[in-house]
Amino acid sequence: MTKAVLTSISQLALKALLYEVSLSPKPGLVDRFDNGAHDDMSFMTFIDSMIALSPFFQAYIETGFAYAKEEPLLLFNRLRQLGQKAEETMFCATQGINTHKGLNFSMALLLGATGAYLARTPHLMTDLGRFSKEDTLAICRLVKPMTAHLIQTDLGHLNTKKEFTYGEQLFVTYGIKGPRGEASEGFTTLTDHALPYFRQMISQNDPETSQLRLLVYLMSIVEDGNLIHRGGIEAWKGVKADMRLLLQQDLSTTDLRLALSSYNQCLINQHLSPGGAADLLALTFYFAFLEKLL
């Protein structure tokens, strides 16, 4: 019974990734229609990556459930070790292409936290109905003590390094903390912005329109390291401003699709991809499935 419940929830994480890549059109991002601003990956690359990561999603939630009483830092270390194995498996499946590195990190923590939360709330295990928004908030808050040390330990001593990873370079150059920062704050972009917005949208619109509007909203607010890495601070600010204007127009679904298709070409021409917004889109979908919003 327990394993079946944990398996079903881990499959929601996979489903969230499938929904994210399938949502179309997504400016600058890989979707069903084209590869966006990416010349090294396609829709099929994402499928390969998701299949490789799927067994680890189950391992994350089972680890959180099994070690729910452990000190948060010890649980984090277990999840990170699993996450590193998952990352290696992903790169093997994609021939070295980074499809889901940051998202895998976030999913490891949130699935681990989901498992730990379920261990502490057994009624959700016996009657797996809709998670409340309070359940979602509690899960995200469990991540905070697991990752309170992360910025200092991972990014606090970079002055001694000569070569940086992509995330480290963003921190050194711009102070962008990326997924580490989001996790260490308890995923407040999710709990305070993305999910409240999506709950409102889904109560007023059909699912696809709500998802497209959520993407635009995220692109208008997210500190997007991918955009900044590719185009610098001004390019990122420009995309945010463009998306704020698009939101204000309150377009019909048909017109919104046309606007996003047009903006896709604009971002392709500038080689810009809002990968940070895409990751948070997938994480929002995960909790939307738990809450049965979708």
From Swiss-Prot:
It is an enzyme of class 2 (transferase). It comes from Streptococcus pyogenes serotype M3 (strain ATCC BAA-595 / MGAS315). Its EC number is 2.4.2.52. It holds the Pfam family CitG. GO terms for biological process: prosthetic group biosynthetic process. GO terms for molecular function: ATP binding; triphosphoribosyl-dephospho-CoA synthase activity. HAMAP family: CitG (MF_00397). It catalyses: 3'-dephospho-CoA + ATP = 2'-(5''-triphospho-alpha-D-ribosyl)-3'-dephospho-CoA + adenine. This is Probable 2-(5''-triphosphoribosyl)-3'-dephosphocoenzyme-A synthase. Keywords: ATP-binding, Nucleotide-binding, Transferase. The keyword Cytoplasm does not apply. Transmembrane segments: none annotated.
